[in-house]
Amino acid sequence: MAGDSSLLAAVSLLSACQQSYFAWRVGRARLKHKIAPPAVTGPLEFERIFRAQQNSLEFYPVFIVMLWMAGWYFNQVFAACLGLLYIYARHKYFWGYAEAAEKRITGFRLSLGILTLLPVLAVLGVASRFLNEYLDFHVAKKLRKPF
């Protein structure tokens, strides 16, 4: 595992702040529309903001685990850059959804693409580490010198 994982930690911290901000926006929408918890229905504006936050929250554990796995086992810089792009995609998704349901699509597709790529990188990294550690097969060396 990487000795210094400060890039992954910084992206994780930034993403946690984003999740907190989304929750705060739901709280503001509750006040604006006078919707007391545990109610989750109301005007369409509230429901879109609430749903955008809930969807982001549903994907968050997968994002965090895959970010760290890809960073530890594949490449920290690449994973952190993908993490920043994911945060941007979630921002675009949240604000698009808050405005109109149709405007969420671009951000959603981008974030889904990143959530598809991060696990692939994590699996490649873990497989490479496994082969190296337990079978003494060095993928990186084989790629440099195939024969």
UniProtKB/Swiss-Prot annotation:
The keyword GTP-binding does not apply. The chain crosses the membrane at residues 6-26, 62-82, 107-127. GO terms for cellular component: endoplasmic reticulum membrane; intracellular membrane-bounded organelle; plasma membrane. It catalyses: RX + glutathione = an S-substituted glutathione + a halide anion + H(+); 1-chloro-2,4-dinitrobenzene + glutathione = 2,4-dinitrophenyl-S-glutathione + chloride + H(+); leukotriene C4 = leukotriene A4 + glutathione; (5S)-hydroperoxy-(6E,8Z,11Z,14Z)-eicosatetraenoate + 2 glutathione = (5S)-hydroxy-(6E,8Z,11Z,14Z)-eicosatetraenoate + glutathione disulfide + H2O. One of its GO terms (biological process) is lipid metabolic process. Disruption phenotype: Deficient mice display resistance to induced ER stress with reduced cell death and mortality. It is found in: Endoplasmic reticulum membrane; Microsome membrane. Its main location: endoplasmic reticulum. It comes from the Eukaryota. Keywords: Endoplasmic reticulum, Leukotriene biosynthesis, Lipid metabolism, Lyase, Membrane, Microsome, Oxidoreductase, Transferase, Transmembrane, Transmembrane helix. Its EC number is 2.5.1.18, 1.11.1.-, 4.4.1.20. One of its GO terms (molecular function) is leukotriene-C4 synthase activity. Each monomer binds on GSH molecule but only one subunit is catalytically active. It is a multi-pass membrane protein. Catalyzes several different glutathione-dependent reactions. Catalyzes the glutathione-dependent reduction of lipid hydroperoxides, such as 5-HPETE. Has glutathione transferase activity, toward xenobiotic electrophiles, such as 1-chloro-2, 4-dinitrobenzene (CDNB). Also catalyzes the conjugation of leukotriene A4 with reduced glutathione to form leukotriene C4 (LTC4). Involved in oxidative DNA damage induced by ER stress and anticancer agents by activating LTC4 biosynthetic machinery in nonimmune cells. Homotrimer. This is Microsomal glutathione S-transferase 2. It comes from Mus musculus (Mouse). The gene is Mgst2.
